[in-house]
């Protein structure tokens, strides 16, 4: 994703020595999109469609984009941070997506989840994207004296011994 370009570029690398641009989507084309400061991108296939889940760190949101036809990506849904009280809790009406930097996708028990690291909220947010038109936040974990999530910036997922883990990098 191009953070300064506020969007995504889709590049065909079928011939690695000759990459070619085939599609793009930017926040500049439509300022209502959650692509300002696009940072993290994760790709998944649900049903017969392929989606890019993109974090917009300046828009404080996440976009789900259908890229099944790479030349014409289409926004399917978006989530934004909501009320910003400075203290990220669901009780404050926030979605804890302030400054999302990275996203990974994992399917667990038949459901597909996007795990988002938000550096300004010092949190990770787990979003059920099985129904891409209606993404639903299922859990959020915040930084605390017993957790190292301050300025969470990177996420990676691994399955070890039948359990699924997210490893979060923070500063």
Tell where the protein language model's regions lie, with residue ranges:
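Feature marking well-ordered beta-strand scaffolds used for ligand recognition
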Residues: 1-171
